[in-house]
Amino acid sequence: MFAVRVGLQKFNIAHKFEIASIITLYANWIREGKLKVNSDWNKERQIKFTVQDPCQLVRKTFGDPMAEDLRYVTKAVVGEENFIDMTPNRSNNYCCGGGGGFLQNGMPEARRAFGKLKADQIKATGATYCITPCHNCHAQIHDLSEHYEGGWHNVHLWTLICLSMGILGENEREYLGDDLKEMDVLFNREEDVST
């Protein structure tokens, strides 16, 4: 989105469309009652979540309103009491160290060293899961957890939306920990599909 937005501005390209993130759409749909999520599944479990504010999405493109939408959706699906924010956060959040091509550049030691600050930041929250709405952040933060033995799982926002709606499919459980991987939700069993 950042490249499209900057490209349109830089080359003064006329357009009749609005650039929006799926996160803002999720937030709007939840506010309007079109996306019916809830956090009941996590009331007793009390699994803690934090979020990564992607540089390209928050700081460089949409700013803190995007970060607020991300938190709104997260709290709606995991419960406000189960959300732990990183410090610093929003537009001031630390870079994960995997963006700008660094993830694919073949220098994992340097990438991990740069990402150590992010790993320590996530660890400090005590959260079991880090929600990563950016592909590069997702891959980097997953690697950081394994490399630095962080103990957290990282997960896509969509996975938690599906879980909160009771429609989490078998193929959407790859990044979940054992605490959620086997969670029994609608359409998880054959008898659910037939009813």
Predicted features along the sequence, with ranges:
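Iron-sulfur cluster-binding electron-transfer modules in prokaryotic oxidoreductases
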Residues: 1-195
